[in-house]
Amino acid sequence: MTREQQAYDESQIQVLEGLEAVRKRPGMYIGSTSSRGLHHLVWEIVDNSIDEAMAGFCDEIGVVIEEDNSITVTDNGRGIPVGIHEKMGRPAVEVIMTVLHAGGKFGGGGYKVSGGLHGVGASVVNALSTMLEVEVHREGKVHYQKFHRGVPAADLEVIGTTDRTGTKIHFKPDGDIFTETTVFEYDTLASRLRELAFLNKGLRIKITDMREEEKSDEFHYEGGIASFVEHLNRTRETLHETPIHIEGEKQGVYVEIAVQYNDGFTSNIYSFANNINTHEGGTHESGFKTGLTRVINDYARKHNLFKESDPNLTGEDVREGLTAIISVKIPDPQFEGQTKTKLGNSEARTITDSLFTEHFSRFLIEHPQVARKLVDKGLMASRAREAAKKARELTRRKSALEVSSLPGKLADCSSRDASISEIYIVEGDSAGGSAKQGRDRHFQAILPLRGKILNVEKARLDKILANNEIRAIITALGTGIGDDFDIEKARYHKIIIMTDADVDGAHIRTLILTFFYRYMRPLIEHGYVYIAQPPLYKVQQGKDIQYAYGDAELQEILSQLPDKAKPGIQRYKGLGEMNPSQLWETTMDPGQRTVLQVTLEDAMKADEIFEILMGDRVEPRRDFIQENARYVKNLDI
């Protein structure tokens, strides 16, 4: 972005409304009061520093998790204005900290481009913190003010002199609001800060954790999003050595795109608008996809790489094996939905499309060998898609009520209400038999799988759909897969993976999760996927039987037995060792069981781990195992 020395003082701070109701209804402002909402507080403060960086006035940001789980964020920007605000009659910094929708991002004067959740920013963090301190280095003086739950403890005061500029904010979230947790996750903060460093090339961001064992990371990438794509592809075999990097500006919209193809079968496209991850895509992403498909088809036609009778490659074909980052900086972003995850600006589509088309066309002409590889990969994907289409027809159910087309080994439930229905995907026929006998037939369906399903990370869709176990899963769930997926057609709102508590069981569970993540991801995003927790131990003392789900629970049960007791302890290796009534009581009875919901906090991290664990390359997997071996408690060997 170009640096323009604009006035950034108290006159640039606009006030829209007062700070009432934030403490009463925090979810309206930060999404939730769970761990996600807690971390959102940090992003609100960091986003203000990022706005300074995007305007060209800040190149260093620091985030510290203090010993008491409070947070300190520092930057070397211009410092929040401290002059008296004309309308409010209070220092501008106090207005920003205490008035909702007050800030330099509303009138277009202080910042041309900014992020932040609808600009609610610092005042919401202040309202939801037991304590917040702000220290501003500006015009040679250090200004300081402290707040409690959004209310100033004293007036802004000058506490010293300084030869630098910048802002330091220290806050402690309020445990009365964040009742679930007030403990910050280092990895959650670090992965987003790394993302922000990639998206703002040259910016240096440091995170430090002062709790138990001090650790820190520093993120600084001169390559920007091209470095980001290299980072995402580092465990994969790439088709061309360096990412294709494109940047340009039209009508005040700045577009930066980096793409690199690998030999995998899935695409990973991440889009951002003003540094905000647009999970649901939007106009910038669709503009990129349109341009990509058109350019590759035009190139292939012009260079006679297709037969004349061949149809054009589809978007799905040309995106196979693609890793791409699209980042736009736009003056007046229109985000659809309160969570800001879909960009709606129509100009972003045309500008992204035209800039990408122009640069990517030139790249293909200048690199004919790479162009040929991309077209060949698309053609192979097209053939696989046609084969998959035929295979898919075999798996498609004729209607949600027509049971005849369901897989033969599925023991369906009698309920047709998907919201109360659940399906257990069970490892092995013997456990499947026990589960069928032990279940509640009204709302519980059982689908036994024979052996291990295909590793979808290493296979194309046509091969995946030829696998009987996967076809049984697709047909039973009823949603379709990939681009045809429709969450409304889900026949069950709880899909519970139930495997043995050993290495093989864990492997089968990972294979099923890999399939869901790659081809039925909305099931995970909507919270439909669960993992059953069968007991590890059965403790029998006379006629009294208790079950333990882990070593700590086993020790607790044993400690409560009489001193001279000699209980029988059985460690379950497989589900088949339990009879139907035991399986129901321990693992399937909704009133007694424990099931773990599978959630998706960080799609990029999940993508990377699936690729490391399930992909072709051995080296990244070995490194991962060596790094994480110290966390293993029970080895099943």
From Swiss-Prot:
Location of this chain's protein in the cell: Cytoplasm
- Any one GO molecular function term: DNA binding
Q: Which GO terms describe its cellular component?
A: chromosome; cytoplasm
Q: Which keywords describe this protein according to UniProt?
A: ATP-binding, Cytoplasm, DNA-binding, Isomerase, Magnesium, Metal-binding, Nucleotide-binding, Topoisomerase
Report the protein's function.
Answer: A type II topoisomerase that negatively supercoils closed circular double-stranded (ds) DNA in an ATP-dependent manner to modulate DNA topology and maintain chromosomes in an underwound state. Negative supercoiling favors strand separation, and DNA replication, transcription, recombination and repair, all of which involve strand separation. Also able to catalyze the interconversion of other topological isomers of dsDNA rings, including catenanes and knotted rings. Type II topoisomerases break and join 2 DNA strands simultaneously in an ATP-dependent manner.
What's this protein's family per the entry? Belongs to the type II topoisomerase GyrB family.
Q: What is this protein called?
A: DNA gyrase subunit B
Taxonomic source organism: Halalkalibacterium halodurans (strain ATCC BAA-125 / DSM 18197 / FERM 7344 / JCM 9153 / C-125)
